[in-house]
Regions:
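Conserved beta-strand-loop surface patch within small alpha/beta domains used
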Residues: 1-88, 97-161
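Histidine-centered nuclease catalytic patch
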Residues: 94
Length: 161
């Protein structure tokens, strides 16, 4: 399902920003929304409901940093979403510096991957906040890959309530 706008409640933004500031390492989070209507159709708005911070283990190597989330944890989140009639529609994670380009590892380890999903990469381990309109890169999942939004598109489509 593709949306025109993603409406982000203050509680979801604050919980995400807090999770990102917990340590000087990469952190991953998921935003959920209610399951509504035709999953192949388009809806005007996604009303985000929750920030889910999975149990995760940070890693570092000469090639970069990452977090690993066990399959059982991802299954737990999906079952919880099912019980709540929600769906994971946005994945977010931090990068150590200002470079928020989507890496090949980001593509290989995508968690939320349906068409219309978002992947948001926040700079500096979230030290400056989420920076959704002026620092983070926002990507939208298309059939074959992720499409980078412009800063203008992010400002118009990500609505902080």
């Amino acid at each position: 399902m593709s949306y025109q706008r993603w409406k982000i409640p203050p509680s979801v933004a604050a919980e995400t920003a807090h999770a990102f500031r917990r340590g000087q390492h990469e952190v991953f989070a998921i935003w959920t929304a209610a399951v509504l209507g035709d999953p192949q159709g388009a809806s005007a708005d996604a009303d985000l409901l929750r920030c889910v911070v999975p149990d995760q283990a940070p890693g570092v190597a000469a090639t970069g940093v990452w977090v690993h989330i066990q399959g059982q944890e991802l299954q737990r989140i999906q079952l919880d979403n099912y019980r709540r009639r929600e769906r994971s529609i946005v994945q977010l994670h931090t990068h150590p510096g200002a470079d928020v380009r989507m890496s090949q590892l980001d593509r290989d380890w995508e968690v939320v991957r349906h068409v219309g999903a978002l992947s948001i990469i926040v700079p500096l381990y979230g030290a400056g906040g989420l920076r959704l309109h002026d620092g983070a890169n926002v990507y939208e999942r298309e059939a074959d890959d992720w499409r980078l939004w412009s800063r203008t598109e992010a400002a118009e489509r990500l609505v902080l309530e």
